[in-house]
């Protein structure tokens, strides 16, 4: 049987898939099951300014599996700034960005609470404007793969 999907970490902050894997997936009609589209919660903004909420992933694993680097925080802030500039919930922006990709993506997200699940699902119909996508692309050029 042929491969139907691959599961890779994929988010605004982690785009290794964009190199050769995306081309293979398009050519072979393979869907990406992207995990951690919110980058372990980093793209929610909840960890900004040194905050570590009780019960959060960072409270259990301080470096989020090696994701916390010196280059991380400016990148996260830049994406949060794009969302803020356009009046978008950063969670909704990060999830909607997955649907802008030129290959098939189905995002696998995690929610610890029902409130988090409601927040994610309430943005399911968001379509990012070309302007927002261009600004996201500009941030990526400034901060490619911060971890």
Where are these regions (language model features)?
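Beta/alpha (TIM)-barrel catalytic core signal, keyed to glycine-rich beta->alpha loops juxtaposed to Asp/Glu
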Residues: 1-138, 143
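Substrate/cofactor-recognition hotspot
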Residues: 146
């Amino acid at each position: 049987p042929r491969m139907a999907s691959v599961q890779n970490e994929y988010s605004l902050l982690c785009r290794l898939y964009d190199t050769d894997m995306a081309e293979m997936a398009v050519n072979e009609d393979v869907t990406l099951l992207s995990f951690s589209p919110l980058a372990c919660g980093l793209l929610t903004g909840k960890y900004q300014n040194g905050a570590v909420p009780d019960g959060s992933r960072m409270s259990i694993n301080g470096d989020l599996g090696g994701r916390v680097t010196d280059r991380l925080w400016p990148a996260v802030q830049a994406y949060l700034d794009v969302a803020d500039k356009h009046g978008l919930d950063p969670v909704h922006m990060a999830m909607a960005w997955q649907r802008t990709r030129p290959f098939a993506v189905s995002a696998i997200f995690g929610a610890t609470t029902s409130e988090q699940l409601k927040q994610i699902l309430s943005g399911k119909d968001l379509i990012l404007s070309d302007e927002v996508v261009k600004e996201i692309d500009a941030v990526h050029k400034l901060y490619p793969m911060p971890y």
